[in-house]
From Swiss-Prot:
Oligomer status and interactors: Component of the commander complex consisting of the CCC subcomplex and the retriever subcomplex. Component of the CCC subcomplex.
PANTHER family listed in its UniProt record: COMM DOMAIN CONTAINING PROTEIN 10, COMM DOMAIN-CONTAINING PROTEIN 10
Gene of this entry: commd10
Organism whose genome encodes this protein: Dictyostelium discoideum
Lineage of origin: Eukaryota, Amoebozoa, Evosea, Eumycetozoa, Dictyostelia
Family: Belongs to the COMM domain-containing protein 10 family.
Protein name as annotated: COMM domain-containing protein 10
Length: 211
């Protein structure tokens, strides 16, 4: 499963890697420590605004470049946690990218020190803020024209979600009153429904390999 490059090869990712390679290694490792401890903490800043300004001036990079670096590092740790990679396997994956060896060692060291804590925390959290609660469906028919009896059929799927902020786990008694319900309605023709089904089959196969 991890034989492929789990980090992909997008231009945005590679641009951020190029910036990371130029950073001073000891300071970069301190940044990684802050990043890894924010994995799974939704809507929480990694650095304060004043800290970001200091680091941007220190590294002589723009705010947009710094944001790209943080997002890239977060993505690497999120993928690492998703696949439950060991520090050595993380190194093997990073070798498939353009990341320099000294920065790869930083990721390895930080993950080795923090992986147990991060993985234990993530096991108590939902990765996505919306949790699927209920699925409903119905068929919809529409006459193609007044001169024919041919009907165009489509499937209407209704997905109901709970929007539950898990960051307040210490207030579980109050959380039950703070759950917001969201609804999504999707319409598929026959071809779209088949494509959607095949995607779900692919996802199920990957989940089975992780079970």
């Amino acid at each position: 499963m991890t034989d492929n490059n789990i980090f992909g090869n997008t231009k945005r990712f590679n641009d951020s890697i190029e910036l990371i390679n130029k950073l001073e290694t000891p300071r970069f490792q301190k940044i990684l420590t802050r990043v890894v401890n924010k994995i799974g903490h939704r809507n929480e800043r990694i650095f304060t605004e004043s800290e970001e300004n200091i680091l941007q001036n220190l590294f002589k990079i723009t705010s947009l470049e710094f944001k790209g670096i943080l997002e890239c590092c977060s993505f690497i740790f999120e993928q690492t946690a998703y696949y439950s990679l060991s520090p050595n396997n993380l190194v093997n994956q990073l070798k498939k990218t353009m990341l320099n060896d000294d920065k790869t060692s930083c990721f390895q060291s930080v993950w080795e020190d923090n992986s147990e804590h991060v993985l234990n925390f993530l096991r108590t959290q939902s990765i996505a803020p919306l949790q699927l609660n209920e699925i409903g469906w119905r068929l919809h028919y529409q006459m193609s024209s007044s001169k024919t009896i041919k009907r165009n059929a489509s499937a209407i799927m209704e997905l109901n979600f709970n929007n539950n902020n898990n960051n307040n786990n210490n207030n579980n008694n109050n959380n039950n009153n703070n759950i917001n319900n969201d609804k999504m309605i999707l319409e598929f023709n026959k071809e779209q429904l088949l494509e959607f089904y095949n995607k779900l089959e692919s996802i199920q196969e990957k989940l089975d390999t992780l079970a």
